[in-house]
């Protein structure tokens, strides 16, 4: 069993490193167009700022990891920095949660025990609330603060607004997921949603139950107009996300059916433009430069709220 844990840890680390493209970001702060991180202190002219909070993904469900995000993962969010809406300038705050650990830790994923205590997702919701309150104390109006996130960060975003609907202006969930590659592993495209999720429940009952608990909470309590981006070839929740359409006010965008947007092939870029590689996984489509096609949709969300 110890060898299995060792193998899985190395495997996850390898996957994380390949996604990182060698340009990891390991600290909180505002990001400039050149990916320079500035710590939160005083915000100049805060009433004329729009703050986007970025919640990164995770390399495991409940444990710590080596870094929070990377240049290739956050490039599209940075592309919005400096844009203005009604005279209000957009800033991007990268919120790192890589040092946070849930009460049951990384090993819970391999357990059949029901989850007890606060998960990493729960703690990330609290972390976001703390940051929002700090920004408000510095003079930024709540309606001009937007919580956003990719993958586990996307699910964090949905949970945040289901628990704290009046604390921020709005949010964006990119490829919300935190419970493994459900679509691919349980062959949802072949077996269908119901049978695929039944197999997930049979293999990982505790994890199935916690996912259901979170989804039910979101369906019941989420009332704030949000954006959600999904992709059918996302191996995580690409074919298991139709439940989002049941949420009043939710604007769900299914990005495309393949790895193109508006007829253009999609690539990810690292620190240098020469660090270019094709997108081969629908889970990363929101990180491909072609995704900037949707920047006007994202800016429109901000305009509606301010």
Protein language model regions, located:
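Short, surface-exposed "cap/lid" segments of acyl-processing enzymes
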Residues: 43-85
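N-terminal cap/lid segment of alpha/beta-hydrolase-fold proteins
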Residues: 21-45
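Alpha/beta-hydrolase active-site loop
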Residues: 112-138
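Active-site-adjacent alpha-helix of alpha/beta-hydrolase-fold enzymes
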Residues: 69-81, 230-272
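C-terminal catalytic histidine-bearing segment of alpha/beta-hydrolase fold enzymes
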Residues: 251-303
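Cap/lid segment of the alpha/beta-hydrolase catalytic domain
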Residues: 92-122
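Primarily recognizes the serine-hydrolase "nucleophile elbow" in alpha/beta-hydrolase
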Residues: 134-137, 143-192
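The feature captures the conserved acid-bearing segment of alpha/beta-hydrolase catalytic domains
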Residues: 178-256
């Amino acid at each position: 069993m110890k060898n299995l844990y060792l193998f899985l840890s190395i495997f996850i680390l390898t996957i994380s490193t390949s996604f990182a493209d060698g340009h990891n970001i390991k600290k909180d702060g505002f990001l400039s167009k050149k990916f320079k991180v500035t710590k939160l202190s005083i915000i100049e002219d805060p009433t004329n700022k729009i703050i986007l909070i970025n919640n990164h993904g995770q390399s495991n469900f409940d444990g710590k990891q080596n870094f929070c995000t990377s240049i290739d993962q956050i490039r599209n969010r940075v592309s919005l920095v400096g844009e203005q809406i009604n005279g209000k300038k957009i800033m991007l705050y990268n919120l790192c949660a890589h040092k946070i650990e849930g009460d049951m830790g990384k090993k819970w994923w391999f357990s059949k025990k029901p989850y007890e205590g606060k998960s990493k997702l729960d703690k990330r919701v609290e972390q976001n609330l703390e940051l929002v309150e700090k920004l408000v104390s510095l003079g930024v109006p709540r309606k001009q603060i937007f919580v956003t996130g990719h993958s586990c960060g996307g699910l964090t975003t949905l949970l945040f607004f289901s628990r704290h609907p009046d604390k921020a202006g709005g949010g964006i969930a990119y490829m919300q997921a935190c419970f493994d590659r459900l679509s691919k592993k349980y062959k949802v495209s072949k077996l269908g949603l119901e049978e695929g999720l039944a197999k997930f429940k049979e293999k990982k009952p505790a994890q199935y139950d916690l996912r259901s608990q979170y989804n039910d909470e979101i369906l019941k309590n989420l009332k704030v107009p949000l954006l959600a981006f999904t992709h059918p070839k996302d191996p995580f929740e690409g074919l298991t996300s139709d439940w989002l359409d049941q949420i009043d006010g939710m604007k769900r965008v299914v990005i495309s059916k393949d790895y193109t947007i508006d007829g253009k092939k999609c690539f990810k870029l690292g620190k240098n433009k020469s660090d270019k590689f094709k997108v081969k996984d629908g889970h990363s489509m929101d990180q491909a430069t072609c995704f900037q096609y949707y920047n006007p949709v994202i800016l429109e969300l901000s305009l509606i709220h301010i």
